[in-house]
């Protein structure tokens, strides 16, 4: 099991501590680490989650976002034929991976490329929370 220290990222993400805490907490869930995934900081307001879903067709994957919860499910079709393996090193099990998202993080899209599912996220700051210039009288 790997331990990831995201604390160096806290310095450049003032006010985003909650996002990193939620991502760290997500690692401790009892899902066995399958499938593996990466969370990438693309720029100040954009993130990308890459999930290794080799062996799954696009039609076997389901992505749902509700409130601040992103759920990715993979379920193989029941019609797969029974195989006799001499050695099976590639997992073919179904999965459900959940990501708790910080406030104002929106899912912008997803695509499947070469066995990796990429989910694009964007931080959208409401107008009320954006900095405003105060005039001095």
Curated annotation (Swiss-Prot):
Membrane-crossing residue ranges in chain numbering: none
GO biological process, one term: protein stabilization
Entry keywords, A to Z: Chaperone, Cytoplasm, Stress response
Gene Ontology CC: cytoplasm
Occurrences of domain sHSP (ranges): 28-137
Coiled coil segments of this chain: none
InterPro entries for the chain: A-crystallin/Hsp20_dom (IPR002068), ACD_IbpA/B (IPR037913), HSP20-like_chaperone (IPR008978), HSP20_IbpA (IPR023728)
Entries under CDD domains matching the protein: ACD_IbpA-B_like
Pfam families: HSP20 (PF00011)
Subcellular location: Cytoplasm
Main subcellular localisation: cytoplasm
Record note on quaternary structure: Monomer. Forms homomultimers of about 100-150 subunits at optimal growth temperatures. Conformation changes to monomers at high temperatures or high ionic concentrations.
Protein function: Associates with aggregated proteins, together with IbpB, to stabilize and protect them from irreversible denaturation and extensive proteolysis during heat shock and oxidative stress. Aggregated proteins bound to the IbpAB complex are more efficiently refolded and reactivated by the ATP-dependent chaperone systems ClpB and DnaK/DnaJ/GrpE. Its activity is ATP-independent.
HAMAP family on file: HSP20_IbpA (MF_02000)
Cross-referenced PANTHER family: PTHR47062, SMALL HEAT SHOCK PROTEIN IBPA
Assigned protein family: Belongs to the small heat shock protein (HSP20) family.
Name this protein carries in UniProt: Small heat shock protein IbpA
Annotated source species: Salmonella typhimurium (strain LT2 / SGSC1412 / ATCC 700720)
Primary gene name: ibpA
């Amino acid at each position: 099991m790997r331990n990831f220290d995201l604390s160096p990222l806290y310095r450049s993400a003032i006010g985003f501590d909650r996002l990193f805490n939620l991502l760290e907490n997500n690692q401790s869930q009892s899902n066995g680490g399958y499938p593996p995934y990466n969370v990438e900081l693309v720029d100040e307001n954009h993130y990308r989650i890459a999930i290794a879903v080799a062996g799954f067709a696009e039609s076997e994957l389901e992505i749902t976002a509700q409130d601040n919860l992103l759920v990715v499910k993979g379920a193989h079709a029941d019609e797969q034929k029974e195989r006799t393996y001499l050695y099976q090193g590639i997992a073919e099990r179904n999965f459900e991976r959940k990501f708790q998202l910080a406030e104002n993080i929106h899912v912008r899209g997803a695509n499947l490329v070469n066995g990796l599912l990429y989910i694009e996220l964007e931080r959208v700051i409401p107008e009320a929370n954006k900095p405003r210039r105060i005039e001095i009288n």
